[in-house]
Design a protein with these regions (language model features):
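Conserved beta3 VAIK motif of the Hanks protein kinase fold
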Residues: 108
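Nuclease-adjacent, charged terminal/linker segments that flank catalytic cores
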Residues: 1-49
Length: 176
């Protein structure tokens, strides 16, 4: 509502009611969550790939990350970051990537229930990427943003970031 400045709750409900043929609705916590159904995707010329309910919480946290990072325009969802180390091609697939006004790479990882071992493997790759990026971009570092849901996970992620010497910002968003 606040992103699109559509006024009050009654107006928002009226708009959502008008869009009903193109939307699916579910409850998340105590709020309704609306998302495009197959017809809604077709309206925009997309392939009709609908977010499954199992991935809905992940998608919502990714949307919260977008809002928290001031709505970057060039947001790319699950797009590869490719690099070469020791003549071997490697890649990382963050949940989101974008560049800021200084053209610095930002990668966003949404961590709701991922095993810490998987996060550790990701941070090892980000360590490699950081070293290569630093050399290519005059000492500048890529920024890795982790959005998680508990203080415990925040602490563990910060420990791993220190261990692998990666510039990581960890945010706790407990409402999702």
């Amino acid at each position: 509502m606040s992103v699109h400045d559509i006024g009050g709750i009654r107006n928002a409900n009226r708009i959502m009611r008008d869009l009903k043929p193109y939307l699916s609705k579910t409850m998340q916590g105590k709020e309704y969550v609306y998302y495009l159904n197959k017809e809604g995707h077709a309206l925009f010329g997309e392939d009709g790939k609908v977010v499954s309910r199992g991935k809905l919480a992940h998608a919502l946290l990714r949307n919260e990350a977008w809002l928290h990072l001031f709505c970057p325009d060039d947001l790319q969802i699950e797009t590869d970051i490719r690099y070469i180390k020791n003549k071997e091609k490697k890649k990382i697939v963050p949940d989101v990537k974008f560049r800021d006004e200084e053209n610095i790479l930002h990668a966003v990882e949404v961590d709701r229930s991922q095993k810490m071992k998987v996060n550790e493997e990701k941070l090892k790759k980000y360590e490699e990427l950081t070293q290569i990026y630093k050399q290519k971009h005059n000492g500048k570092l890529p920024v890795i943003h982790f959005f998680t849901v508990t203080k415990y996970r925040e602490k563990k992620l910060e420990e791993l970031a220190r261990m692998y010497d990666v510039f990581v910002k960890v945010y706790v968003i407990a409402s999702i």
